[in-house]
Amino acid sequence: MKPTRPNTDIPAWLQTTTTTPTPAIKAKFWQRNQRHLRQLLSRLAQPAPVTATSHWRVAPQFKLIQLLLLVILIALSNNLILLWSLALLVGCQLLWLPPRQLRRFMGSWLISVGMAMLFVLPSYWLAGPTTLLFFGLKTSLMLANAQYYRLTTPFQDLLAGLKALHCPDLLIMTLAIAITYLRMLGQHLLLTMEALELRTVAPTAHPYRLIGALFGNLYLKSYTYALELYAAMEARGFNGHYVRSTGRRTHWRDYLALSPAIIVWILFIFWRH
């Protein structure tokens, strides 16, 4: 009797491929935060070009003084006419911006105003809608001036302005290191989130507790970076003081750029008396 050959054919129901439609779900906790972090890192890697708002270059310290004068004046003034004139001054400065930079200014300014209004909102129940609108107007003007300065001033000019105003070297060094290593810490946070996503097999039960652990790890990493950087700077002979380079001489155009803020301050002083 010959041995029978076993039947090795695969059944037909195993050969048919069935595709199960997967319902569209919302973005997960990891993916959503990683997308926002990648967008932030791309902006830090390729910052937007600074807009030239005038035909001559104003000294960095004069631009910084103008910003401080306007912000302090907005904080001290309670006159609606004076605040309206300051709003017109900012509006006239915005007219010199290109359309692309103006759209970027409006987007960042509206987001910052919306976040600031969350802190001003309790005044509605304490003092009424009039106080809320008044403080909202002052906060919006402060943020508009700060946003305009950020849009038209590179970071190196900010450091040069602080040096020209004789700010402490420790403050300038801390600010420069913080901006320089911000992208490095962001990349470390992104890599940590990707590693946790690969090791996570279930939905995150406590996302806010996990966020606290991530930022705690980020703080320890920044502390390690700071110690390594300080040791490297000491090895290269840094003694905590910057060599002050000879800056350019002040010109009458610098004082002319500062004149609108001075005129508004004079009106504010004489209006009160």
UniProtKB/Swiss-Prot annotation:
Upregulating conditions: Induced by L-lactate but not by a racemic mixture of DL-lactate. Makes part of the larR(MN)QO operon.
Alphabetical GO biological process terms: nickel cation transport
CDD domains reported in the protein's UniProt record: EcfT (cd16914)
One Pfam family here: CbiQ
A GO cellular-component term linked to this record: plasma membrane
Localization (cell): Cell membrane
Classification via InterPro entries: ABC/ECF_trnsptr_transmembrane, ECF_transporter_component
Keywords: Cell membrane, Ion transport, Membrane, Nickel, Nickel transport, Transmembrane, Transmembrane helix, Transport
Disruption phenotype: Deletion of both larO and larQ leads to a loss of lactate racemase activity. Addition of Ni(2+) (but not Co(2+)) restores lactate racemase activity in this mutant.
Membrane topology according to the record: Multi-pass membrane protein
Main location: membrane
Transmembrane segments annotated in the record for this chain: 64-84, 117-137, 159-179, 210-230, 251-271
Stated family: Belongs to the CbiQ family.
Its biological purpose: Probable transmembrane component of the energy-coupling factor (ECF) transporter complex LarMNQO involved in nickel import.
SUBUNIT field: May form an energy-coupling factor (ECF) transporter complex composed of an ATP-binding protein (A component, LarO), a transmembrane protein (T component, LarQ) and a fused possible substrate-capture protein (S component, LarMN) of unknown stoichiometry.
Entry protein name: Nickel permease LarQ
